[in-house]
Amino acid sequence: MSGRGKGGKVKGKSKTRSSRAGLQFPVGRIHRLLRKGNYAQRVGAGAPVYLAAVMEYLAAEVLELAGNAARDNKKSRIIPRHLQLAIRNDEELNKLLSGVTIAQGGVLPNIQAVLLPKKTQKAAK
């Protein structure tokens, strides 16, 4: 009679912490990198989930704006130029990534007002 115990827990299919949190970014990998990076002696259980959520949100925001920039240029593939245009035209992302240089990004189109041709007024007849 003894030996089996009282019906232990049946292990179901394992769920990743990313899927539990409803995220695409890897919570387990971020946790491992936080531990190995010597940022602190200990890392809480919620910290990698929060960080993964923030990183996923920022990536989605940049990709959405870059996709819009690619569509405006009638392209189906996002290139570094589209990322540059997306980031520099958005006030908050530009402030966040002000010190970042994007390779092959180019510059924003900007012509000084002084250099534009003068508007001539024709005499009304």
UniProtKB/Swiss-Prot annotation:
Q: Does the keyword Transport apply?
A: no
Q: Which residues carry this modification: N5-methylglutamine?
A: 104
Q: Where is this region: Disordered?
A: 1-23
The protein depicted here goes by the name: Histone H2A
Give the residue range of the signal peptide.
none
Q: Which Pfam families match?
A: Histone, Histone_H2A_C
Query: Per the record, where are the segments of Basic residues compositional bias?
Result: 1-18
Say which family it is in.
Belongs to the histone H2A family.
Q: What do we know about how this protein assembles, alone or with others?
A: The nucleosome is a histone octamer containing two molecules each of H2A, H2B, H3 and H4 assembled in one H3-H4 heterotetramer and two H2A-H2B heterodimers. The octamer wraps approximately 147 bp of DNA.
The answer to keyword Repressor applying to this record is no
What is the protein's known function?
Core component of nucleosome. Nucleosomes wrap and compact DNA into chromatin, limiting DNA accessibility to the cellular machineries which require DNA as a template. Histones thereby play a central role in transcription regulation, DNA repair, DNA replication and chromosomal stability. DNA accessibility is regulated via a complex set of post-translational modifications of histones, also called histone code, and nucleosome remodeling.
Positions of modified residues (N-acetylserine)? 2
Q: Which GO terms describe its cellular component?
A: nucleosome; nucleus
Keywords associated with the record: Acetylation, Chromosome, DNA-binding, Methylation, Nucleosome core, Nucleus
The species this protein belongs to is Sepia officinalis
Where primarily located? nucleus
